[in-house]
């Protein structure tokens, strides 16, 4: 007998995947698993969503779980929002939605898209970044919050699992602490990036995907800098409120130095 389902499987798309394909995995897959959980009388269904399920604008105001779910945007954001709405509105079993920000830390074997960027900067193979930032959460802090939600997550509630907003310049300075020789890096100015982004929409998806793959061979991590990823970096909310997760789930935040070090070495 299974009492708890923690559903973390998803297709993370950054602009190159067809909407129908992402929808099939992120929404239909979640619905199928939720239906099966109800039929098998599972006690609690914990859905690992994302901060991207929420409407990010305005980015300079307090960002909490009362924000509207996103209704337009890229396939990943929209399908995760639809799945979260489905899960949290279910009445047949207890449900909880966990909404992490940008996850980094130990055992990033593949590595993840952000992990690859961190490791690319650390190795000196990625000599430039966008002048933006992200809210980083340590994978161990996230895991503890998910575990706590089994007992402490309230039915039908969503929880933002966030750390603190950090600019890529701050992240870069932390990375250099773990370099034998400090690498040089160029940050593309935000205004220049914002003016250039509309031009990417003029090119076919297939061509952009191939160009990204080629760039990634020379500069590891650069293949993940798609139009959607860059928009996320330059428009990431700066005031994500994790007080609800701290109160209900006992969320504690690790120092950024620990998270970056674990990403590089563990």
Regions found by a protein language model. Give the residues of each.
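NAD(P)H-binding glycine-rich loop region in Rossmannoid oxidoreductase-like domains
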Residues: 1-25
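Glycine-rich NAD(P)-binding loop of the Rossmann-fold in SDR/ketoreductase-type enzymes
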Residues: 4, 21-32, 74, 78-79, ...
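Conserved Rossmann-fold NAD(P)-dependent oxidoreductase catalytic core, especially the SDR/UDP-sugar
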Residues: 28-76
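Flexible, glycine-rich beta-alpha linker
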Residues: 53-55, 93-114
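Catalytic helix-loop patch of NAD(P)-dependent Rossmann-fold dehydrogenases
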Residues: 59-97, 102, 126
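A conserved pocket-lining segment of Rossmann-fold NAD(P)-dependent short-chain dehydrogenase/reductase
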Residues: 117-137, 141
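Mid/C-terminal beta-alpha module of Rossmann-like enzyme folds, strongest
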Residues: 145-225, 242, 256-264
């Amino acid at each position: 007998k299974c009492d708890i389902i923690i559903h973390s499987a998803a297709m993370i798309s950054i602009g190159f995947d067809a909407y129908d394909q992402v929808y099939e995995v992120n929404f239909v897959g979640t619905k199928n698993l939720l239906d099966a959980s109800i039929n098998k009388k599972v006690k609690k269904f914990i859905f690992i969503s994302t901060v991207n399920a929420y409407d990010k604008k305005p980015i300079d105001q307090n960002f909490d779980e009362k924000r509207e779910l996103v209704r337009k945007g890229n396939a990943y954001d929209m399908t995760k929002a639809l799945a979260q709405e489905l899960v949290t509105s279910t009445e047949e079993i207890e449900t909880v939605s966990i909404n992490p920000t940008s996850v980094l830390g130990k055992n990033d074997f593949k590595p993840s898209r952000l992990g690859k960027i961190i490791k690319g900067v650390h190795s000196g193979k990625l000599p430039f970044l966008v002048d933006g930032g992200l809210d980083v959460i340590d994978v161990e802090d996230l895991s503890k919050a998910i575990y706590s939600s089994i007992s402490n997550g309230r039915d039908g509630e969503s929880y933002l699992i966030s750390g603190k907003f950090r600019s890529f310049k701050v992240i870069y300075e932390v990375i250099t602490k773990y370099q034998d020789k400090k690498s040089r890096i160029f940050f593309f100015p935000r205004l220049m990036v914002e003016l250039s982004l509309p031009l990417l929409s003029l090119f076919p998806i297939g061509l952009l995907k191939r160009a990204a793959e080629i760039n990634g061979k020379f500069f590891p991590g650069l293949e993940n800098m798609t139009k959607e990823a860059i928009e996320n970096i330059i428009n990431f909310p700066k005031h994500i409120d994790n007080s609800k997760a701290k109160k209900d789930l006992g969320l504690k935040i690790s120092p950024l130095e620990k998270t970056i070090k674990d990403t590089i070495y563990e």
